[in-house]
């Protein structure tokens, strides 16, 4: 490793500072010359003398800069330096004139006077005894902060993280790090178990420390939620804990009991599945146990029926059919009756089974009754599709609940204006694409609905489950506690679409004929990766846009995997090269080894509840503002400004959001996306490359989800053997949830 460069000088001017992450651009005055320095430097103030280590870099727009990796504040050694430091603005209430008077009075002894005899500052004209104490306190606080940063950097803690730690703990940072560094994983965003564990190892915390085991088990439980689980069976938790911590299960069990006593975990038992077996102990992170319990309770409270006679409802439905020239089959009529009669009902069905017609009939029915209806879906794309299909304005669930900026990065701590204290003012709420709704969002939605409101949940249970924890739609169906109508009849118009017909064949495990006689379902047999790449580029850039009358950016490539020759990462680099090549008039930005370029199709890859957006009208006038950009949202890079270091992205629904260069890691190219990321979306045409992959991944419902994303055309490129094998593979990853059980228990308790 090459030795770092060192520079020393006075901080002449802070050019820019991001108050959220501490990223700073400053001018450093160094014996007759100035140097632009950059880095995460939240604590540095103008006038300070620093010695910094780092590297010289060349910025495309601003030229030569020095990137600071670590620094040390130097004590000013002479009167000129002291006056410069005190008058820089670093000490609140001390300007240049007052600084000059202080140094004139005490000379090179100024800092010692401030630290040891602060009352003597009152000898200077313009300084009261109170102000003298305030000046001394500020100097002491800055010194303490710098000492803490040096202490933290000694354990390999980066400046930006060190600043967060100090802001959280202040002077207690020394005690906390030496006693229980794992507390940081609980208290500070950005410090996970692995970071805390690395620091603990340097400090010398024992491998079998109680603090370490508890923090490790909490980490395992939280990681499980990222896989969609709400709890873990105790044997699974202990096995994963042992792999992480290298500690015997017996030692972990004691810590687990202590976590339950401290209300950090909840331990319950599930009855044995077979006679003679022991009950299964399961473990939740506390918040998820109570989240499920509360969700079950609210669902039970909504599950009431109206006093009206079913026959009267059916007569009114007949009038609706006649007025709007709708012809409902028996199951569709049953669905509308249940929606009118029940506090909560579930409507499911695959493509072409008439869900949209049924929803339209429900809307007409409720409108005729003079009821206020809200229509929502988990994503902007799904909401837009529902608006177009019904003529009734739909929005995202986050927008319906009025997301505010009073949140942190965790979906568990999102704040909505609409909640139990300020519920939604609606008579009927219809939620589409329910398979995408996780336990967090479901709980937030139910919290904002008062009993007596009708809730209609619409979805396809055969789609992939939500990205977040839980399996809400399936659990509601499994509970058998709510009216459920499953539409299975494929209507004549839909039956003419091979997309619909083949989707149902895939779901039923039936063979799909690949003879390419279809008008909307094609299979191009190709077995060489290089050939497949060329075919994908040709399809997206030339053939499909003309065939389905759409722009190339509206054609979506969906692939099962992120890695590999046909994975998202590789395909996006290839597609970007052909679909949006570099040009002199296109600004670009390096981002984690990839390039983001003006005109690129991009996707938001994590929920950012604090990201501000605006919808712009004619001449750029702002028509609406809001907050929140979510995992899976698609957009186009409209501009990259190297001077302000801002990337502007236009998302669907005309939302413009500005990303700092530091936030660019929230975006990735989206010419190709995983099938999982396409949940709830629909495209004019999709292209699916299939050549092989792990059996646990290449499943029937993954293929079903991919095919049902297309509105006009599906083209699969690759191996027909892989395609047919996926149809035959009905393995589904089991999610550990107990919502269905909680709902049944709630029903039994209140029977």
Task: Identify the role of each PLM range.
Residues 433, 459:
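Walker B catalytic acidic pair
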Residues 17-27, 643-649:
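Short aromatic-glycine-enriched beta-strand elements
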Residues 273-428, 477, 483-492, 499-523:
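ASCE P-loop NTPase motor cores of helicases and related translocases
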Residues 508, 624-626, 631-751:
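C-terminal accessory regions
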Residues 3-18, 54, 634-638:
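Structural detector for short beta-strands of small beta-barrel domains
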Residues 372, 425-428, 452-456, 713:
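Loop/turn-to-beta-strand initiation segments
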Residues 23-32, 36-37, 45-273, 278-280, ...:
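Accessory alpha-helical DNA-binding modules that contact the DNA backbone or grooves
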Residues 461-627, 746:
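Conserved helicase motor core of P-loop NTPases
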């Amino acid at each position: 490793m090459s030795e770092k460069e060192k520079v020393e000088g006075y901080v002449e001017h802070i050019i820019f500072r991001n108050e959220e992450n501490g990223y700073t651009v400053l001018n450093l005055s160094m014996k007759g010359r100035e140097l632009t320095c950059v880095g995460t430097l939240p604590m540095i103030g103008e006038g300070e003398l620093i010695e910094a280590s780092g590297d010289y870099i060349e910025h495309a727009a601003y030229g030569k800069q020095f990137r600071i990796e670590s620094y040390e504040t130097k004590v000013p050694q002479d009167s000129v330096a002291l006056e410069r430091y005190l008058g820089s603005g670093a000490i609140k209430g001390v300007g240049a004139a007052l600084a000059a008077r202080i140094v004139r009075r005490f000379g090179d002894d100024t800092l010692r006077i401030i630290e040891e005899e602060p009352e003597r500052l009152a000898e200077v004209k313009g300084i009261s005894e109170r102000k003298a104490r305030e000046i001394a306190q500020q100097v002491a606080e800055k010194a303490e902060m710098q000492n803490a940063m040096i202490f933290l950097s000694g354990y390999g803690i980066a400046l930006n993280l060190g600043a967060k730690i100090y802001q959280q703990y202040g002077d207690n940072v020394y005690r906390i790090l030496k006693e229980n560094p794992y507390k940081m994983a609980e208290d500070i965003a950005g410090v996970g178990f692995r970071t805390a564990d690395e620091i603990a190892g340097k400090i010398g915390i024992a491998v079998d420390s109680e603090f370490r085991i508890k923090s490790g088990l909490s980490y395992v439980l939280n990681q499980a939620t990222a896989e969609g689980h709400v709890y873990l069976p105790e044997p699974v938790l202990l096995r994963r804990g042992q792999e992480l911590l290298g500690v015997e299960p017996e030692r972990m069990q004691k810590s687990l009991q202590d976590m339950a006593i401290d209300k950090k975990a909840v331990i319950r038992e599930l009855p044995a599945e077979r006679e003679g077996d022991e009950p299964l102990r399961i473990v939740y992170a506390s918040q998820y146990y109570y989240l499920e319990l509360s969700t079950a309770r609210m669902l039970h409270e909504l599950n009431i029926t109206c006093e009206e006679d079913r026959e009267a409802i059916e007569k009114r439905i007949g009038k609706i059919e006649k007025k709007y020239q709708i012809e409902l089959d028996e199951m569709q009529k049953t669905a509308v009756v249940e929606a009118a009669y029940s506090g909560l009902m579930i409507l499911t069905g695959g493509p072409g089974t008439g869900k949209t017609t049924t929803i339209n009939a429900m809307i007409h029915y409720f409108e005729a009754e003079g009821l206020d209806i809200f229509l929502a879906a988990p994503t902007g794309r799904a909401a837009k599709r529902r608006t177009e299909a019904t003529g009734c304005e739909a929005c995202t669930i986050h927008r319906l609940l009025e997301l505010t900026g009073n949140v942190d990065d965790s979906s568990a701590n999102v704040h909505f204006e609409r909640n139990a204290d300020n519920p939604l003012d609606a008579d009927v709420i219809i939620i589409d694409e329910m398979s995408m709704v996780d336990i967090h969002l479901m709980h937030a939605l139910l919290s904002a609905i008062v009993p007596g409101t009708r809730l209609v949940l619409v979805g396809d249970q055969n789609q992939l489950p939500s990205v977040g924890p839980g399996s809400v739609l399936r659990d509601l169906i499994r509970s058998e506690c709510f009216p459920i109508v499953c539409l299975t009849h494929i209507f004549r118009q839909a039956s003419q679409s091979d997309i619909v017909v083949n989707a149902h064949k895939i779901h039923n495990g039936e063979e799909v004929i690949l003879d390419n006689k279809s008008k909307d379902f094609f299979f191009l047999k190709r077995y060489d990766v290089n050939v497949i790449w060329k075919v994908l580029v040709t399809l997206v850039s030339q053939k499909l846009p003309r065939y389905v009358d759409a722009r190339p950016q509206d054609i979506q490539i969906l692939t099962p995997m992120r890695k590999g020759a046909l994975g998202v990462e590789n395909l996006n680099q290839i597609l970007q090269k052909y679909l949006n090549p570099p040009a002199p008039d296109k600004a670009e930005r390096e981002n984690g080894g990839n390039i983001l370029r003006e005109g690129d199709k991009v996707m938001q890859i994590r929920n950012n509840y604090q990201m501000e957006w605006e919808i712009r009208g004619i001449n750029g006038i702002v028509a609406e503002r809001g907050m929140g950009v979510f995992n899976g949202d698609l957009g186009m890079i409209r501009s990259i400004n190297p001077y302000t270091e801002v990337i502007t992205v236009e998302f669907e629904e005309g939302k413009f959001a500005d990303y700092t260069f530091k936030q660019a890691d929230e975006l990735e190219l989206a010419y190709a996306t995983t099938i999982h990321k396409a949940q709830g979306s629909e495209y004019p045409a999709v292209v699916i490359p299939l050549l092989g992959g792990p059996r646990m991944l290449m499943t029937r419902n993954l293929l079903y989800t991919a095919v049902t994303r297309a509105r006009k055309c599906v083209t699969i490129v690759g191996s027909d053997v892989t395609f047919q094998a996926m149809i035959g593979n009905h393995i589904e990853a089991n999610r550990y949830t107990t919502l269905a059980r909680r709902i049944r228990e709630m029903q039994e308790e209140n029977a």
